């Protein structure tokens, strides 16, 4: 009893404190306060002045404002218990929060929220007060998303024949501004495929049915109005949260904004998403400790809402998150939707609190549509067709059990029971697979509400024709010039990879190799009739040809997901990224070779002339850049690390054998291999630098001017990189089959 009374007193005290805060806050938003009233008028005027809003939108906006003025009931907590008082206070706080953004919670939902437990209310208040108030009603171009009879098939090729597999079978639905649509179903039901189709990430020729945005088909111009958050968190692990969002703002926001305004926008997104505490923490990854999973997901969402998209698509935003973090993510999405955006998300198995945040629901099973409508009416619909839970359970859990055929705790119609008995007998006797539950639910949906929902989808969206045409506006210009993109991407690349270049493992590898070589060729005699230094020079050519190839191979395959994501959002020009990626590391590429040559050069007693030393450094540098080009070309062409490593091993071994040290005369029909070998040209240049004016030939190779070798290395540097660049141009950003 003591514990209960103390808990009730604590809850009531919190309720009274919250009520006082709300009372003082309501004074700030009252009509009598000129400053706050002016602020609201400023927001209203700014929104109404936006060309994105029609006269109908203005009327709706005025309606929301009128609702907002009456959305704050008097907080009379006298005579209430602790739980009831806290429930009343939380309802008022939610009403205040949504009215501040221009949207209000219906009175029925406020009353219903009082039935929640005290723990649920406390957690909802924390989520609401930490995120809802922060999202302001900023002008957003409205997008009314409709999809009717969506079908999608893939062709699977076998050894002798090919067959088509149906992934989506006539899916229909809609999502309008201010709504959160959830795509729910078991694994393999087609949720991600449908989301990709809605985001225009498939070749439109492979999709049946129609997807419309304000009654207009998809076009590339829509890329700037659609945000897409993938299931995997694609981020650079060594950048901080603040750096990640700042680079996104600088690259994606229009050039009409100054650099300071873009940085302020990034700071406001950090604040809106509640990332202030971790903004200076690295993102982290598999081998780098960083932010938590929920914070990483919020950073991904922040990258997409940075440009104020009208349509936001999210693939499993709550996967691998605990229930509390998942609730905060969905609460945040709910608030973003109420700010006038259209939100569509896939979700696997939400909790009951998450489920009640959804405005609309699509239930899929094996690519078939089992339900589309309001999420709040889903249980009523399935009860109407004879399927209802025997126990009190989470609605999402009930729906997933139903579509998966788990009928232990579910009441089903007798007709379905009879069919299930027959199917089980066939499964036992003939080993035949048939989803009788899916067939029954699909037929029930088609006969009950599918026709009515399609008729609703046929109605035109409530927008003026002028506003509809704005969705096909000319393609947005780049946020930065080519040179500015190059500089920014170079700086980002150096910050991201600075940890790899100077890792203790790489420095130890280079220094230990240099010391071993210096000891083996300790103070060798350059005037000897048998030049032993040629072996050292050849090894230097091989080492600095082998090392960069297998480092560069990983460049584009590892960054493929990031490159695809950023190119999908028109973040930068591919040419600016490629040049920045291949040139920003060049200063860093000089540090380890210089350190290597300083150790080897003086320990082995190579030619002690400043000119010879710097020419040796330049020769090794040309070899490194040429070898990197080969690695980049192989990696970009194959985009498969196993295949790329195998091909690179064979190529480097061939170049080494044809490098002029092991084989003096190569048969004429494969002599061209020698001229493609950067090892051969590097070795000849190093021999020239060390033995010029001392010997006319070394190991049977005449010492020439070196112009031919330098020209060959420069040609390789340019040629290999061109191959890599055009391979990236050909790279598919997403599956189109």
Swiss-Prot record:
| Family classification | Belongs to the ABC transporter superfamily. ABCG family. Eye pigment precursor importer (TC 3.A.1.204) subfamily.
An annotated GO cellular component: membrane
Output the InterPro entries linked to this UniProt entry.
Answer: AAA+_ATPase, ABC2_TM, ABC_transporter-like_ATP-bd, ABC_transporter-like_CS, ABCG_dom, ABCG_transporters, P-loop_NTPase
- Keyword Transmembrane helix present in the record's keywords: the answer is yes
CDD domains from the xrefs?
ABCG_EPDR (cd03213)
Q: Where in the cell is it found?
A: Membrane
Q: Where in this chain does the record put each ABC transporter domain? A: 145-391
- What are the boundaries of the region Disordered? 26-59
Q: Can you tell me which residues the record assigns to a coiled coil?
A: none
Q: Which Gene3D superfamilies match?
A: P-loop containing nucleotide triphosphate hydrolases
Topology with respect to the bilayer: Multi-pass membrane protein
Task: Supply the name of the protein.
Answer: ABC transporter G family member 27
Mind giving the lineage of the organism this protein is from?
Eukaryota, Viridiplantae, Streptophyta, Embryophyta, Tracheophyta
Q: Which SMART domains match?
A: AAA
Recorded hits in PANTHER family, A to Z, give:
ABC TRANSPORTER G FAMILY MEMBER 27, ABC TRANSPORTER G FAMILY MEMBER 28
Q: Where, in this chain's numbering, is ATP bound?
A: 185-192
Q: Where is the composition biased (Polar residues)?
A: 26-38
Domain ABC transmembrane type-2 stretches: 484-691
Alphabetical UniProt keywords: ATP-binding, Membrane, Nucleotide-binding, Transmembrane, Transmembrane helix, Transport
Query: What GO terms in the biological process aspect are recorded for it?
Result: transmembrane transport
